[in-house]
Amino acid sequence: MLFADIILPLSLERNYTFGIPIELHDKVKVGCRVEVQFGKRKVYSGIVKKIHANKPEYYQVKPIRNLLDIEPIVTETQLKFWKWMASYYMCTEGEVMNAALPSHLKLVSETFIVLNEDIEIDAQSLSDDEFLLIEALEIKRSKKGVE
């Protein structure tokens, strides 16, 4: 099985390795964007930095979900420059990627919190923080209804 080291648009000390599904073996190239799941639910577009056959020992590899580019959008020279910039400016390659790529090339999932109108909430049983959160969500919902 092949693996890819992916630069994620996050402030991470290192890049993470993802598995390349068999159907993408011939298509994934260094410099292409791929869609990966990082964490339990977050989905990001990352840049393939390196392709290899070394399975990580300390964590379970997740597969690349999707290939976003047919051809690389970043050259190997640019990737080397990003690494140099990260070292020189004491930041991560993910932070350099965030600054270097236009926002429409970055895929980031978002989490939305909404009230379930079918559930009745007992305000007496809520902690102070829970009460404030519910109150803020109710205010936001009422403002949407006005517009």
Model-identified regions with their sequence ranges:
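Accessory, non-ATPase domains that flank or precede helicase/AAA+ motor cores in DNA-metabolism machines
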Residues: 1-147
